[in-house]
Amino acid sequence: MNFIPDNKSKPFFSLYYEKDGYDIKGKRIMGRQAAGWSFLKSIVQSQKYSRLGFYLKGAEQQKLLKDDVLTLLNNNNKSIELEYLSHSNVDLIESYGGIMLPGPDLTEFANSRAFYGHNRYSLCGITHTTASHSVMSSISNLLTSPIMPWDALICTSNSVLQTVNRILEAQSHFLSYRYNKKLDFLPQLPIIPLGINIDEFHFDDEYKSNSRKELNIEEEDIVIVFVGRLSFHAKAHHVPMYTALEACAKELSGKRKI
């Protein structure tokens, strides 16, 4: 296992790496981190690329990145070269075409790019939670940041796109009223659902049976899985789920266990 490639193939973008966006070992693992790690894993393990560019903010992040890449290359017959980028290394970033960010906040990166030329490279962010104050602020700030039409904010569903558009429309109306000027520069908002590696979700009947036994779940019992955080202010409100479970429990009372 090493970092010396056989060729110089590389993707059409570099990745912004900060450990928090890809960390699945902490006590409070969030969906954005699981998605970030899965994306990093797919890029590193892909046989398509032997050279990857990473936009970093210091030596500490560089070490953490190298550790993560070594972990992902473990038992994987592949060599890869890591190219480290900084905000001032514009020519190198430009050679990749752009920077892929693990979150929706493009403002800081757009401000850094502005010193060297808006058209030097693209920025591409992605949404996860959209109902938190910080994320809504990041989205509304797109209207007053040096964002260009060749930038993008990936929306992971139709509902996310609707949310993003409502935030932008509300902020646009406010700014038009405040400054008597319509702001037209917005990023592209493509809908690209999060993907998964289906090969990681193959469980045989023995595994399923043992898992149910460990949780004391009988064969006829019904298992309800809520995928996500029970957070009323930043995720889906949990009351509708509780109401539905209550209705199911009453209907199946004495018949099957939920």
Model-found features: residue ranges?
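Helix N-cap/beta->alpha junction signal
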Residues: K57-G58, P102-D105, T156-S159
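Extended catalytic core of nucleotide-activated donor transferases of GT-like folds
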Residues: Q61-P146
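Well-ordered, non-membrane alpha-helical segments in soluble/globular domains
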Residues: I29-K41, Q62-D68, E169-H173, S209, ...
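N-terminal pre-catalytic "stem/leader" segment of glycosyltransferase-like enzymes
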Residues: M1-I93
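Short helix-capping segments at alpha-helix termini
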Residues: L73-N77, Y116, F174-D184, C248-R256
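Donor nucleotide-sugar binding/catalytic pocket of nucleotide-sugar-dependent glycosyltransferases
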Residues: M148-N210
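Short hydrophobic "strand-cap" motifs at the C-terminus of beta-strands
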Residues: I126, T156, I192-G195, F226-L230
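Conserved catalytic-core segment of nucleotide-activated headgroup transferases in glycan assembly
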Residues: N197-I258
